[in-house]
């Protein structure tokens, strides 16, 4: 059975998709209006999310409770006219499954009890059987996809190897990546060993999400922007490129979005991958990104490299815009969409925030954002 036949067989388990606007935009097909969703759209800005999380007890218990993970995924779709759902989970599920002891402290974000700081730590990391150690994620994907009943497509996701490695080595969030960058310059082979292990796990993890029901995949390279140019190529992009290439072998029909926060400088590098779309944060104008990607395609052709398909764009409203008035939000959305379609394009774009929606946003302002996107005339 070919990969395409296998994907078609998997789809028979679920209701037909009713709203494929986002998928059509990623394929550069005609769309009636701009598709939109929000990173972290199931989150703490919603009172119903807070209530469900309180019932679960803590964040990871919520992630591992199939019924509640399904519920919080669906909550924003009940409020808003969104064009996609995204699995409710966390980017740190892989290192948690590797035994690093993920926990959360109030006001301090995620932490690991057992950070990776020496070769013995690295050698102890298991080769994951994702369908065993992360079976709760796959159960949630299937449950959510079934509950959606074809309403909108479902995103699965993972953190990138580089981003996961920073958390695993630092033991949590970091402002300067002291230990991770220390290895990068003093013992790069150690870091490459870890990134290689993580890339293998990310491939298997995202593959399993597709089998469970995910229709689109996103790789969150949240801290790729902390790297220098050459370091980004070697320690982030190379592994992301490998992951996407293998996913395209296994599931050629599944779109993959690659989002590197702070990665606008490296769109030409990311163009040399099989990702269907690149996510932008708010620091890179969309019209300029389109121009960079068009020129990158020309250069790749001249260099006789494999010419990957044109890249759609996703993004990139500053999340802080949602603190503004409805009039301000609409004006900023219109400016963003003017930029997205400035060069005469009519598709190949998905509206989103430039990073996750924050817990302090008024839910009514999120609706203003979503409705303003749909109201814009392409």
UniProtKB/Swiss-Prot annotation:
<dbReference type="GO" id="GO:0004853">
    <property type="term" value="F:uroporphyrinogen decarboxylase activity"/>
</dbReference>
<protein>
    <recommendedName>
        <fullName>Uroporphyrinogen decarboxylase</fullName>
        <ecNumber>4.1.1.37</ecNumber>
    </recommendedName>
</protein>
<comment type="similarity">
    <text>Belongs to the uroporphyrinogen decarboxylase family.</text>
</comment>
<dbReference type="GO" id="GO:0005829">
    <property type="term" value="C:cytosol"/>
</dbReference>
<dbReference type="Pfam" id="PF01208">
    <property type="entry name" value="URO-D"/>
</dbReference>
<keyword id="KW-0210">Decarboxylase</keyword>
<feature type="site" description="Transition state stabilizer">
    <location>
        <position position="90"/>
    </location>
</feature>
<comment type="function">
    <text>Catalyzes the decarboxylation of four acetate groups of uroporphyrinogen-III to yield coproporphyrinogen-III.</text>
</comment>
<feature type="binding site">
    <location>
        <position position="222"/>
    </location>
    <ligand>
        <name>substrate</name>
    </ligand>
</feature>
<keyword id="KW-0456">Lyase</keyword>
<feature type="binding site">
    <location>
        <position position="167"/>
    </location>
    <ligand>
        <name>substrate</name>
    </ligand>
</feature>
<comment type="pathway">
    <text>Porphyrin-containing compound metabolism; protoporphyrin-IX biosynthesis; coproporphyrinogen-III from 5-aminolevulinate: step 4/4.</text>
</comment>
<comment type="subunit">
    <text>Homodimer.</text>
</comment>
<dbReference type="InterPro" id="IPR000257">
    <property type="entry name" value="Uroporphyrinogen_deCOase"/>
</dbReference>
<dbReference type="InterPro" id="IPR006361">
    <property type="entry name" value="Uroporphyrinogen_deCO2ase_HemE"/>
</dbReference>
<feature type="binding site">
    <location>
        <position position="90"/>
    </location>
    <ligand>
        <name>substrate</name>
    </ligand>
</feature>
<feature type="binding site">
    <location>
        <position position="355"/>
    </location>
    <ligand>
        <name>substrate</name>
    </ligand>
</feature>
<keyword id="KW-0627">Porphyrin biosynthesis</keyword>
<dbReference type="InterPro" id="IPR038071">
    <property type="entry name" value="UROD/MetE-like_sf"/>
</dbReference>
<dbReference type="GO" id="GO:0019353">
    <property type="term" value="P:protoporphyrinogen IX biosynthetic process from glutamate"/>
</dbReference>
<keyword id="KW-0963">Cytoplasm</keyword>
<feature type="binding site">
    <location>
        <begin position="40"/>
        <end position="44"/>
    </location>
    <ligand>
        <name>substrate</name>
    </ligand>
</feature>
């Amino acid at each position: 059975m070919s990969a395409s036949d296998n994907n078609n067989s998997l789809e028979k388990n679920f209701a037909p998709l009713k709203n494929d606007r986002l998928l059509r935009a990623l394929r550069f097909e005609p769309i009636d209006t701009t598709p939109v969703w929000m990173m972290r759209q199931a989150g703490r800005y919603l009172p119903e999310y807070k209530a469900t999380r309180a019932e679960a007890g803590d964040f990871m218990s919520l992630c591992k409770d199939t019924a509640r993970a399904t519920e919080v995924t669906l909550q924003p779709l009940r409020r808003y006219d969104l064009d996609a759902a995204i699995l409710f989970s966390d980017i740190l599920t892989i290192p948690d499954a590797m035994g690093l002891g993920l926990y959360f402290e109030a006001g301090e974000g995620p932490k690991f009890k057992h950070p990776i700081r020496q070769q013995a730590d690295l050698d102890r990391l298991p080769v994951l059987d994702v369908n065993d150690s992360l079976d709760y994620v796959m159960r949630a994907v299937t449950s959510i996809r079934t509950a959606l009943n074809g309403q909108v497509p479902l995103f699965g996701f993972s953190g990138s190897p580089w981003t996961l490695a920073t958390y695993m080595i630092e033991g949590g969030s970091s402002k300067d990546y002291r230990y991770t960058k220390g290895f990068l310059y003093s013992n790069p082979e150690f870091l490459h060993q870890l990134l290689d292990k993580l890339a293998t796990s990310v491939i298997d993890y995202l593959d399993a999400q597709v089998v469970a029901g995910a229709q689109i995949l996103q790789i969150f390279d949240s801290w790729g922007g902390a790297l220098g140019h050459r370091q980004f190529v070697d320690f982030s992009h190379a592994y992301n490129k490998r992951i996407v290439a293998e996913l395209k072998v296994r599931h050629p029909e599944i779109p993959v979005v690659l989002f590197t926060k702070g990665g606008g400088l490296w769109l030409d590098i990311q163009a040399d991958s099989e990702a269907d779309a690149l996510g932008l944060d708010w620091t890179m104008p969309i019209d300029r990104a389109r121009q960079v990607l068009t020129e990158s395609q020309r250069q790749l052709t001249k260099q006789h490299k494999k010419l990957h398909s044109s890249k759609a764009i996703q993004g990139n409203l500053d999340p802080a815009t949602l603190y503004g008035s409805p009039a301000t939000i609409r004006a900023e959305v219109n400016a963003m969409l003017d930029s997205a379609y400035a060069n005469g394009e009519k598709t190949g774009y998905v509206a989103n925030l430039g990073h996750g929606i924050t817990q302090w946003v008024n839910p009514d302002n999120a609706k203003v954002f979503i409705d303003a996107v749909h109201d814009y005339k392409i």
